[in-house]
Amino acid sequence: MTLQQEIIQALGAKPHINPEEEIRRSVDFLKAYLKTYPFLKSLVLGISGGQDSTLAGKLSQMAIAELREETGDNALQFIAVRLPYGVQADEQDCQDAIAFIQPDRVLTVNIKGAVLASEQALREAGIELSDFVRGNEKARERMKAQYSIAGMTHGVVVGTDHAAEAITGFFTKYGDGGTDINPLHRLNKRQGKQLLAALGCPEHLYKKVPTADLEDDRPSLPDEAALGVTYDNIDDYLEGKTLDPAIAKTIEGWYVKTEHKRRLPITVFDDFWKR
């Protein structure tokens, strides 16, 4: 088995999908989890205004609405959380995403004060954060807020991770990567767009340039610029296509380098890191 085949198998990626079937698969998956643990009453997700959170949010709201109708349990709710750092540059996209999702409840938690307070506490301890590490601090603060909300609403935190993100480890460890349940796992980036198109999402929400927008020194840095490859390259790789060897090597390099992000904390029984 080649490394490409190994990666495709590990991430559950497929070269072709039926969008309607995958929508139903994700919604049923979320419903089944909540039905298995009936003490759970909410799904919680941060909404950024980008493709991934818009899709995960819509699927979550659909799951909650169906389950509420099927069970008669009106305590069930989907909570969309806005988590700006100060004022978000693409705030209108966030509002458009909320309008599309139609969540049961919307909360806004501005994380800037908490991030700055944490940075100051570290500074007083003699640690000065780099801009890159501060970006990770933002991602972790966002996740901390979501878990607090989930804890107070008997909920689980929904993730936005998908195959095209997982393969490169393009997420913050214990930040946006630290979630309870990931309904998009297996899909690549272009397949996520197909699901949103099938759901009637406004095109600008899934055709915009993807950006994590975590760094102050490089605001709105495109994901593709940070990775050195395009999402089309990554999707082609996940679909089993043959790529330019240099591009394939870059993608595989990211996969190997970030393997620790896709695993539980390393123990004496692990040897993947020796690869």
UniProtKB/Swiss-Prot annotation:
Catalytic reactions on record: deamido-NAD(+) + NH4(+) + ATP = AMP + diphosphate + NAD(+) + H(+)
A single BP term in Gene Ontology: NAD biosynthetic process
Record has Ligase as a keyword: yes
Residues that coordinate or bind Mg(2+): D52, E165
Residues bound to deamido-NAD(+): Y33, R140, K173, D180, H260, K261
Superkingdom field: Bacteria
Annotated ATP binding sites: G46, I47, S48, G49, G50, Q51, D52, S53, T160, K189, T211
Keyword Translocase: no
Keyword terms of this UniProt record: ATP-binding, Ligase, Magnesium, Metal-binding, NAD, Nucleotide-binding
Listed InterPro entries: NAD/GMP_synthase (IPR022310), NAD_synthase (IPR003694), NH(3)-dep_NAD(+)_synth (IPR022926), Rossmann-like_a/b/a_fold (IPR014729)
GO cellular component, one term: cytoplasm
GO function terms (MF aspect): ATP binding; glutaminase activity; metal ion binding; NAD+ synthase (glutamine-hydrolyzing) activity; NAD+ synthase activity
CDD domains in the record: NAD_synthase
EC number in record: 6.3.1.5
Metabolic or biological pathway, per its Swiss-Prot or TrEMBL entry: Cofactor biosynthesis; NAD(+) biosynthesis; NAD(+) from deamido-NAD(+) (ammonia route): step 1/1
Matching Gene3D superfamilies: HUPs
Annotated family: Belongs to the NAD synthetase family.
Quaternary structure, from the entry: Homodimer.
NCBIfam families tied to this protein: nadE (TIGR00552), PRK00768.1 (NF001979)
Function description: Catalyzes the ATP-dependent amidation of deamido-NAD to form NAD. Uses ammonia as a nitrogen source.
Name assigned to this protein: NH(3)-dependent NAD(+) synthetase
Gene name in the database record: nadE
